[in-house]
């Protein structure tokens, strides 16, 4: 089999029995010696065979009149896989997002490793100890200098590389091999399933929170909404794609999918609210992203006629100038809070009438608060230290446990139908023996 190299559309072609065929070792030829991203990426070559019409030898005049080279290249590129390489995982690891947090502890140098507690030696003070310490320090310095020289001879190349980053943070040197993310193959669905899924349906959105952690290595945390009637994407596929995108070991996909399935199983759809009736509740939000805390208190209509949690979160992020990571976090928190309030309202465990301090007894309007001027109804954005955040989390857990106890106590009280209690059929005349000693009688 003889090969005659030809250059049509900047692609190497071989002639076999006067038919154009791509060999498995196909490599595009460019003057700059760089692979075209649409033809080859990550050393993965498109190995499909493409047959073209017969043409004459490259030296014949018919080759010069051949004008189908652009169509030939277009036909090849249309069947090639796209986006085989991505720098998303590397950008996430730069620390500008809370989706992937690097929890590797910072190690101190050998000179500052030993921490001395001087409070233990306050009573045992002796001047001779300082002389012994000086001798020990001198011997330690000599031994350290000798060891540093030995290490410098062995790792001279590494030190030269580290010295290049004078005044900057040198990259960490790791001897661990890097594992590439496993390839994810697309799932093919029959045409009947796609036609069924194309019908417009009202989604039942469930707030999902996924958090996996490898101690002293990384922590992944994400918020999103999941359709209860989802049939295309399974939790296992979603977890596999997430691990591949973040370059996380594939073993954590089982933990992610288990968390999603658990939250989907715990979700129970609340009964529908009365139609044409506005159900107003007081919502208190507290969302923490990195070191920034967003708190807000507002009134919400559970009927959802005026706004959705997504629209509210988008408006808050734009008005307050928050980061884009607050959008899914606020949406998740608001969905979860509204679901709890809706169940509590149907169970009559919260007051039906909301005191929103509106003027003239209206359902909505300006709030009349002469003492605090509506301070509690204003959104707050604060940047806290880790100690303050830990203290706030403890207070939040304590308040949530208190609310659970109160709701359990309210659930034990039997429900009383007020309409039947005050109806005429239930009224009766009390005799004198049943009257109490109240002055009203």
Swiss-Prot record:
Protein name in the entry: Chromatin structure-remodeling complex subunit SFH1
Gene Ontology molecular function: transcription coregulator activity
GO CC annotation, single: RSC-type complex
Annotated Basic and acidic residues bias: 138-147, 155-166
The keyword Zinc belongs to this UniProt entry's keyword annotation: no
Sorted UniProt keywords: Cell cycle, Chromatin regulator, Nucleus, Transcription, Transcription regulation
Subcellular location: Nucleus
A biological-process GO annotation: chromatin remodeling
Main location: nucleus
InterPro entries, per database record: SNF5 (IPR006939)
Encoding gene, per UniProt annotation: SFH1
Span list, region Disordered: 124-183, 383-407
